Amino acid sequence: MNGELYLKKGMLQLNKKLYDEALETLNKVIKLDDDLASVTSAKCILGEYYFIHQNYEKAKEFLLWIYDRQDELEEEFDDLLSQEIDTASVLMDMMERYKL
């Protein structure tokens, strides 16, 4: 399977509340590293997951990767990753503002 298929599988697993399996699948997307858009989406989903579960250090690990590359991602993918970029920016700002 490629990164895009693993991403879809991970999202389905999250929807079914199969959290451990979803985390494993989304990490496979990152390890495969065959599609920058899928990797970015997987990192965003993982960052959101860890933010919601109050594991802020782990959330920062994933979201900071997007936050640091937002100009590059916007230039290369135009609006395709705008939601992921916005999510990473908002959550990073919240963690900085509230010292989470």
Q: Could you describe each region identified by the protein language model?
A:
Residues 3, 76-100:
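Terminal, low-structured helical/coil segments at or just beyond the last alpha-helical repeat
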